[in-house]
Amino acid sequence: MSTLPFDVRNISWRTLPDIPHVAFWIYAVDEEKRIVDILFKFDAGAKIVLHRHKADYVTLVLQGELRIYRPTGELKEIRPVGSYVAGKADGEPHTEGGGDQDVIAFFSNRGVDELVYEILDDNLAVVATLGMTEFRALFDAQPPQPSTLVA
């Protein structure tokens, strides 16, 4: 089901070369509070890499439908626009992606010890990780957000 578009004019989407079908913008990396806040854009009709969340998180879907798939490829869940879902670290590995249109979803990762995501192969073996260190480097490499000051 198509939803109203989320205004992304002020977002300079970033990508990672080995993770297709997803773009991101990092809003916060706070080592002291152990928070990593990210806006993701998932391609319509595509799935990202198999992964596992290593920190508790909440998601808020801002555009489209976020589709969650089990490691077998079976559709597990559809989160429509406006869905707010909390998840726990070390849940079931999964892939995710968009339905009929690109999905934009805000992820707030909380209580991050070091790892945020484990990237998995088809046998559920860890092939890469993304943690506080990597997200700090990606955040620092982003262009600054436009100023919100009026004067």
Segments the model singles out, each with a brief description of its role:
Residues 44, 53-72:
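Glycine- and acidic-residue-biased ligand/ion/polar-headgroup-sensing regions
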Residues 1-34, 120-151:
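A short, N-terminal "cap"/entry segment at the start of jelly-roll beta-barrel domains
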Residues 85-86, 100-117:
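A short hydrophobic beta-strand segment most commonly corresponding to one strand
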Residues 34-52, 88-91:
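Conserved short histidine dyad/triad with adjacent acidic residue
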Residues 29-40, 107-109:
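Short, contiguous, helix-prone interaction/anchoring segments in small proteins
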Residues 96-98:
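Asparagine-centered strand-capping/turn motif at beta-strand->loop junctions
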